[in-house]
Amino acid sequence: MGSLSLWHWIIVGAVLLLLFGGKGKVSDIMGDVAKGIKSFKKGLSEDDEKPEAARPAEPARSLDHQPVAEQPKVSETHRIG
């Protein structure tokens, strides 16, 4: 079980031929996937080469908090009886 027999290699070759060879739809799809991966990698490398100039961060602003008026208790507003 450690090594692959001749039949295993024939099956692997047939699958690769179906995926990447010929003029079928599957080979076109695989080619498009490969182009997409290449352009993705190219975009990542371009981002690494040209870092954007970091603009200075604005200092944190403090918010003026107004004290909340004390709310009346429920027992004072809703009396039964």
UniProtKB/Swiss-Prot annotation:
It comes from the Bacteria. Residues 41-81 are annotated as: Disordered. Its main location: membrane. The keyword 4Fe-4S does not apply. GO terms for biological process: protein transport by the Tat complex. The chain crosses the membrane at residues 1-21. The keyword Signal does not apply. Part of the twin-arginine translocation (Tat) system that transports large folded proteins containing a characteristic twin-arginine motif in their signal peptide across membranes. TatA could form the protein-conducting channel of the Tat system. Belongs to the TatA/E family. This is Sec-independent protein translocase protein TatA. It comes from Beijerinckia indica subsp. indica (strain ATCC 9039 / DSM 1715 / NCIMB 8712). The lineage of its organism: Bacteria, Pseudomonadati, Pseudomonadota, Alphaproteobacteria, Hyphomicrobiales.
